[in-house]
């Protein structure tokens, strides 16, 4: 099997990540913060060490600002529904995932929130954002990289625009983290949301959010936090203020190990290798007649063959043992921009662990598929 669906979730997982997960299940899986026995205390240590590891990876000095969530979608919902008030205005990119679009749609219908889209292809991103600022604009919400094309959105420009206008910046780093350096001291934001299971090589069912302000806003969910149990309200301070219920300790341990793997390889090495593989893959795809590529970055290459439905091509590749993703990728705005809203695209998404031999097999498979059509 050739796995080219890493933008959905990375596979295979590094041995270090699997070992950390299994070790936690066997040795450190008490309920953290709920009891005073040794297993509970060790689980609490695992979680705190992971907070420190995530904070260090982002060059943040606030481990208490790292909140563990079920996934990046959960993190984005906490941020969006906690920061955006009724009748306010937000500015988003034209490449957003449904994890941003759908929460905002709910706020539009129920609370009269207004939404404007800026163009990620504008030559001057900051000036482009400036055009949409109004007196009731409260936030910029943007991906750092499209999950359809890999197109990057410059964090420095987003950060400067938000600070200039005194508004929140909420960042979706799902497709960028683990691929490029994110330094929150140099390019600050108010909230950064990410999953564990993509380029950080963690497991599904875990994400996190970084909050610059460690006093919580409105809560999305309430419950036990292991602290201040006499109160019927969630704690005001983070991380407990947003972490209701028992956390996924083994997954959190695996995330810390995944970050160690990324650091060991080196972000520059990851970026350079993916750039080389993207280039070779793009050249191979374009050497086939009737193909069109819509973008190639962050390990993502999206394409279509002739006028054939992307779902058909992806299904045919699966028969050759090649895993890709077709359709709209939960990002209709991006496909509207690309002109692929009716057909979607075939998305090939690579990781550091893919190789040229797999690209060659993909090319041969596409050649055989093209002959049969």
Name each region found by the language model.
Residues 1-373:
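Pyridoxal 5′-phosphate
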């Amino acid at each position: 099997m050739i796995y080219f669906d890493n933008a959905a979730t990375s596979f295979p997982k590094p041995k270090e990540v699997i070992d950390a997960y299994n070790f936690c299940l066997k040795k450190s899986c008490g309920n953290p913060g709920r009891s005073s026995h040794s297993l509970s205390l060790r689980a609490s240590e695992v979680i705190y060490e992971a907070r420190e590891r995530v904070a260090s990876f982002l060059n943040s000095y606030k481990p208490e600002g790292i909140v563990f969530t079920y996934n990046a979608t959960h993190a984005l919902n906490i941020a969006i529904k906690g920061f955006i008030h009724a009748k306010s205005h937000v500015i988003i990119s034209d490449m957003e995932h449904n994890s941003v679009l759908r929460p905002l749609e709910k706020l539009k219908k129920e609370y009269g929130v207004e939404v404007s889209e800026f163009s990620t292809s504008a030559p001057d991103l900051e000036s482009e954002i400036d055009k949409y600022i109004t007196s009731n604009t409260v936030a910029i919400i943007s991906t750092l990289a499209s999950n359809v094309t890999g197109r990057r959105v410059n964090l420095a420009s987003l950060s400067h625009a938000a600070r200039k206008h005194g508004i929140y910046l909420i960042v979706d780093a799902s497709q960028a983290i683990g691929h490029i350096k994110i330094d929150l001291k140099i390019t600050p934001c108010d909230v950064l949301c990410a999953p564990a299971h993509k380029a950080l090589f963690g497991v599904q069912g875990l994400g996190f959010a970084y909050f610059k302000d460690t006093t919580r806003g409105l809560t999305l969910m309430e419950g036990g936090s292991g602290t201040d149990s006499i109160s019927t309200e969630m704690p005001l301070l983070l991380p407990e203020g947003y972490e209701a219920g028992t956390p996924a300790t083994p997954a959190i341990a695996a995330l810390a190990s995944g970050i160690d793997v990324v650091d060991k390889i080196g972000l520059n090495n990851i970026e350079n290798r993916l750039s080389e593989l993207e280039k070779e893959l793009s050249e191979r795809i374009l050497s086939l007649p009737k193909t069109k590529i819509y973008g190639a970055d962050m390990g993502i290459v999206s394409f279509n063959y002739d006028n054939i439905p992307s779902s058909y091509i992806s299904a045919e590749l699966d028969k050759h043992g090649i895993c890709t993703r077709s359709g709209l990728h939960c990002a209709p705005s991006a496909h509207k921009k690309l002109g692929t809203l009716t057909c979607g695209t075939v998305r090939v998404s690579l990781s550091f662990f893919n190789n040229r031999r797999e690209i060659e097999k993909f090319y041969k498979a596409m050649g055989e598929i093209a002959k049969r059509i």
